[in-house]
């Protein structure tokens, strides 16, 4: 029996999941899990990339027998730079770091956002890689004189496993430096930001084999296997796991971020799309993920932590339901919720600014739950206007698909049936790319049929 290993790393945790086909169904087994999180050092937020590498290797070693292949997916936009000997020459700064605070405005003269969006189709986020690189150029100009290669975080981890350093297309597309039309690095953007062109390597497709493990890694894990490229932006993998039956489905990858959108064959880069801040991220088989980033479970994760981690998410739901009639709402995409010192205080402040009296904890939680559901509904309306299509269902994958209360509120707000599951959407998407590349599955459509037959999909009617 052939098995495949997905390494799926999010902003708060990572997991290694084995997958295999058995009697026409996809089976999963989690074999390793670890915590992740950005760390504050000397005024900047960093990922402990060396620890992540160790965790990835330890998780591979936890396999009882060698899988056919392994692939790594992570969040988008963050990167490292390599020197001439393949060594990392800068830390992995986290996207929530404040170094890009003023960069979009500073670059507006040379890299106007309207022009940038027209070329890349990538939404305005101050932490987009193009702005991170501009911030680093300003803060550490010398590093670019030594830099030979830029690698996104999953590309770097795959490089540390295989010794082969390449740029994978789906994650590269989130940098706001890849041409939406040509699907290659945009040399004009690179020149305007005054970056060395040589650090941007040829873009490679998900599923490509990089080769076996390096001798160093092989020695640690006790066997060899093929290292493949995943659709290495976790959302690109998650969208693959949506078991929608037709083209009229909206996809929602629900985790720390909520990414809600549709698959399109061509990008939408017009002025209205730009004004609504929709993004066109590269997907598997060059299908565009036309979507919007919404703050997602990040707000609830932080509130839980502040209220005491002993409170389960079920407890938060219970508290929120006890104040279900509370009328206060916040813009879940407001800047103040991106990286506040205290999320509860940030929510409280926003509500009191609107004239509400100081909210209780249940009222704050109710506010966030309802605000999230209503933001999904607003996004679907905008999608219909921008694409000229009517959508008939919302399909949720990822950890948030387990949140029954949020799913019920979402179905009601969107006036659409909600199909929730599978939970491990990103890992499943990672696995099916490997299986298609190895010939175990014939196509994405066959994979989605298998997913529908393999996992419980809960339905919430409006």
What label would you give each PLM region?
Residues 45-53, 122, 126, 203-207, ...:
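Short acidic-aromatic active-site loops that bind/stabilize oxyanions
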Residues 1-90, 118, 146, 218-228, ...:
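N-terminal glycine/serine-rich phosphate-binding loop of ATP-dependent small-molecule kinases
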Residues 187, 193-206:
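A conserved helix-loop-beta module that forms one wall/lid of the active-site cleft
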Residues 67-75, 149, 202, 386-399:
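Short glycine-rich phosphate-binding loop at a beta-alpha junction
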Residues 5-6, 101, 108-120, 131-152, ...:
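Active-site core segments that coordinate phosphate-bearing ligands/cofactors
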Residues 8, 92, 96, 128, ...:
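Small/polar loops that bind or transfer phosphate-bearing groups
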Residues 61-95, 123-129, 158-179, 202-205:
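Short beta-strand-loop/turn "lid" adjacent to the catalytic site in phosphate-handling enzymes
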